[in-house]
């Protein structure tokens, strides 16, 4: 893959994560700005000359973006099937930009802000599925993991930069306080939109619709290799085989992901992604400014900025933690660590923060901030990135898109519930809220220990066999997973009706001459997909009589 294209993917596609992070990191500070409160808050205290929100209005302004994200995540799958990932990313970027414009131009009506948040969420939710998926399909295997993780890195970077912008604008005059913080988000959407416009469609999508020649051209361009390269041919054959397997047995339906074979992993993915929110991370990211204001800090914006900086910096550590420590151990240890941090945070806030005379104990407030940072230190390296990695690795090809969509929507659902109900809960029980998150973190560790297998270093086929085996997650995994996966594939091939082999390209000799491949990609007669069948019985029979060095030809529409 050329350096230019690699940098382009990192900068432009990952910027979709920046858009998500920027919205998350900015809303807490914006709702605390005086001009924003004077226009959209529903309570005013003339004695103290301060504005405040009812719990319902605070929760709706903050949380409605997650409602939009929930539905955006669901509609991303059928949209991608129709127009491809690249075009879908472009379309949802436009939706996101429209939502931001509506927010910036809001009149003194909090309903407009709420509706704009829903519209913005449609784009953010869809892009949270599409961007990592596009990267994983276009990037070559040896850098695929690094490129995909940059999405999460950009999420944390967006949160941090949004906190910096809030820090710089909260003292500005009138509407500039919050319009600048919201309006700057247009930049991230425009960067993503322009960058993706110059990228190619995913080779996997092109093969799935029969445009094999175009897919090969994209792979050659990305890898800077000729069509006869072993790398190109191997990748093409794998994609072709995957696409065949994906449609084997017909399109996957929603009820099927809760069938006997896959429901264990479906519910596990939903649990892992739910606990990703129930760790309490967005308690800080959404309401950090208000939380630290309640601890007596003179500059709650600064405290929130410090927390977001820790989150951004520690995400780099997550790249190495998941690579060398696997998935299970970081999630288990991270959950226990985070539980301890929240327990201490809640205990100090509940028992030591407020003195008997009603003043704040600044030392207690400092302790709370320290343990908040320690929580983020762990989350950014464990539950932040690892939850998405587990969901991306756990499902067979045929079920992957729908299972991942269900898991991700559970994440957005809990995201909304926490963002909406947090004002109600904190107004009722204050810092005791931390005990709830401490319990959830402990439960997350237990669920991971009991149900999540270690998938580090395994192929997707081996991971599938691991979950189908009788091995317990806390026991040593079977050493013959590769043989089990191969045996299952052979069994599947033997039971396939004659003439429907999906492994013709996969088992054919990979050391092929480039002439046939190139000429086929450029000179084949293009026929509608429905009328062509390069894997029919005659073709397979012909392939057995060809010299071993003959190249593989491709058909396209």
Swiss-Prot record:
Extracellular domain ranges by topology: 31-58, 109-112, 166-179, 286-301, 350-363, 426-432
Origin species: Schizosaccharomyces pombe (strain 972 / ATCC 24843) (Fission yeast)
Homology family: Belongs to the major facilitator superfamily. Sugar transporter (TC 2.A.1.1) family.
Ranges of Basic and acidic residues composition bias in the record: 485-510
Source taxonomy: Eukaryota, Fungi, Dikarya, Ascomycota, Taphrinomycotina
Entry GO MF terms: carbohydrate:proton symporter activity; high-affinity D-glucose:proton symporter activity
Keywords: Glycoprotein, Membrane, Sugar transport, Transmembrane, Transmembrane helix, Transport
Keyword Transport applies: yes
Processing and modification events after translation: Not glycosylated.
Gene Ontology cellular-component annotations: plasma membrane; plasma membrane of cell tip
Primary location: membrane
Protein name as it appears in the record: High-affinity glucose transporter ght1
Transmembrane segments: 10-30, 59-79, 88-108, 113-133, 145-165, 180-200, 267-285, 302-322, 329-349, 364-384, 405-425, 433-453
Residues modified by glycosylation: 357
Bias kind Polar residues: ranges: 546-557
